[in-house]
């Protein structure tokens, strides 16, 4: 089975909490704080595996979670870092955020990897908060929360040349002749239900990868037939070989087929439509009127397609010349990465350390993940903790933003269940 799309849930590891601890040893008075930091949570990392060819594995397992960081401990013992979780994906995998449908990564090289969910940073232990005026802090930071999201994986074949054309025009036969690939071949439409790859090796030219893409029909750009499943794989190729049944044994007009396929390419992507295209007039061994080929060639050339080859995949007539021309064209076209527009690119939002302020009557309400994290770290009933609390609010710009909003002495500031009067 060929699976080329998948949707999975990923969750990184939470950062370990910092420790609140004081040194307690016989004969050592006032040992001081010795709480260690929490460990970092594990990342979820997508890693290219060149041996994988489909996304089939993700139909059986859809949820992936990395290891959390260990909590800090006394004696300045740091928590253990959580292990990263590596998820193998095939080359040519596009990673998208499921919520926004924006592209996060294009994993198209053997060494490619991408951190799709970052582990939370470990919280600082209380030994980190000592100052000349705060000798015994009894607070520590909690670990940063984990990241979690649903992501979509789309596999796009990494082939140099794509064979396109209506069903049953001989694409699979051509692939089997020019490579060692053995696709299913039969005399009915949509025999090929998944893309097949083969390596073309001809003396005197560089080897290249060719893909037999499932047949396209009218309306494919709107999802008809194999539709978008077909077109997704054509995007990666640098050269297209447009296979036409010149014999018309099924009653179709070759020129009409040529126009319809190119119209679908153009509807789907202008860049795809403009890609170099070689026309392969196949099944010429069944053509009994040579004028029909010349007439077809003349019409096609008027559209700017000057590379028209009369071939027979069944008898191998003209096939070598066709492949040599494909190799020549490839040598003139550099390999480029998938272009991702700014509109389509996923922008990571920092959700783990944010806040917002709104005003209700004379009360200013500060809320968000920043507030939750700060209040979890301090004891608001302790004077030392409160001094640290106000220092953090000032350093993070909360006080400045409150003043810009017009706060006055005596106005109430609320952070979750904790309230205090604002004083300049």
UniProtKB/Swiss-Prot annotation:
Family, as annotated:
Belongs to the TRAFAC class OBG-HflX-like GTPase superfamily. OBG GTPase family.
Look up the record and name the cofactor or cofactors this protein needs.
Answer: Mg(2+)
Q: Which domain of life is it from?
A: Bacteria
The UniProt keyword set, sorted, is: Cytoplasm, GTP-binding, Hydrolase, Magnesium, Metal-binding, Nucleotide-binding
Any single Gene Ontology cellular-component annotation: cytoplasm
Protein purpose: An essential GTPase which binds GTP, GDP and possibly (p)ppGpp with moderate affinity, with high nucleotide exchange rates and a fairly low GTP hydrolysis rate. Plays a role in control of the cell cycle, stress response, ribosome biogenesis and in those bacteria that undergo differentiation, in morphogenesis control.
The residues listed in the UniProt record as binding Mg(2+), with positions renumbered to this chain, are: 172, 192
Q: Known HAMAP family for this protein? A: GTPase_Obg
Q: Which residues form a coiled coil?
A: none
- EC numbers listed for it are 3.6.5.-
What is annotated about its quaternary structure and interactions? Monomer.
Name the gene behind this protein: obg
Please identify the protein, giving its name as recorded.
Answer: GTPase Obg
Q: What are the binding positions for GTP in this chain?
A: 165-172, 190-194, 212-215, 282-285, 312-314
Q: Which Pfam families match?
A: DUF1967, GTP1_OBG, MMR_HSR1
Domain annotation OCT: ranges: 345-424
């Amino acid at each position: 089975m060929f699976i080329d799309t998948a949707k999975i849930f990923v969750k990184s590891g939470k950062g370990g909490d910092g420790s609140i601890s004081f040194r307690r040893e016989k004969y050592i008075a006032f040992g001081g704080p010795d709480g260690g930091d929490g460990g970092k949570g594990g990342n979820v990392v997508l890693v290219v595996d060149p041996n994988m060819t489909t996304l089939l594995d993700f139909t059986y397992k859809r949820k992936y979670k990395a290891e959390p960081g260990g909590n800090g401990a006394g004696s300045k013992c740091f928590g253990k870092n959580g292990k990263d979780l590596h998820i193998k994906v095939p080359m040519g995998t596009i990673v998208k955020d499921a919520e926004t449908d924006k592209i996060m990564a294009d994993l198209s090289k053997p060494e490619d990897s991408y951190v799709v969910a970052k582990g939370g940073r470990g919280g600082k232990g209380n030994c980190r908060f000592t100052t000349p005026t705060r000798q015994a802090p009894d607070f520590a930071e909690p670990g940063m929360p984990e990241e979690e999201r649903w992501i979509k994986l789309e596999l796009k074949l990494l082939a140099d040349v794509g064979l396109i054309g209506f069903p049953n025009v001989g694409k699979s036969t051509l692939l089997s002749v020019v490579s060692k690939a053995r696709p299913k071949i039969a005399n009915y439409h949509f025999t090929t239900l998944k893309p097949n790859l083969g390596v073309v090796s001809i003396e005197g030219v560089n080897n290249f990868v060719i893909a037999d893409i499932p047949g396209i029909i009218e309306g494919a750009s709107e999802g008809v037939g194999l539709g978008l499943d077909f077109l997704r794989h054509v995007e990666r190729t640098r050269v297209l070989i447009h296979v036409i049944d010149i014999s018309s044994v099924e009653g179709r007009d070759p020129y009409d087929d040529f126009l319809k396929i190119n119209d679908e390419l153009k509807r789907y992507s202008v860049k795809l439509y403009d890609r170099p295209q070689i026309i392969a007039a196949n099944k010429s061994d069944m053509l009994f009127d040579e004028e029909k080929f010349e007439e077809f060639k003349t019409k096609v050339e008027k559209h700017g397609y000057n590379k028209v080859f009369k071939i027979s995949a069944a008898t191998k007539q003209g096939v070598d010349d066709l492949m040599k021309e494909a190799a020549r064209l490839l040598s003139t076209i550099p390999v480029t990465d998938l272009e991702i527009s700014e509109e389509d690119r996923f922008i990571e939002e920092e959700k783990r350390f944010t806040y917002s302020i709104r005003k209700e009557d004379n009360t200013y309400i500060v809320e968000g993940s920043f507030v939750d994290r700060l209040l979890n770290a301090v004891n608001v009933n302790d004077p030392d903790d409160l001094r640290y609390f106000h220092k953090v609010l000032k350093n993070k710009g909360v006080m400045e933003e409150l003043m810009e909003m017009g706060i006055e002495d005596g106005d109430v500031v609320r952070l979750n269940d904790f309230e205090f009067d604002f004083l300049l």
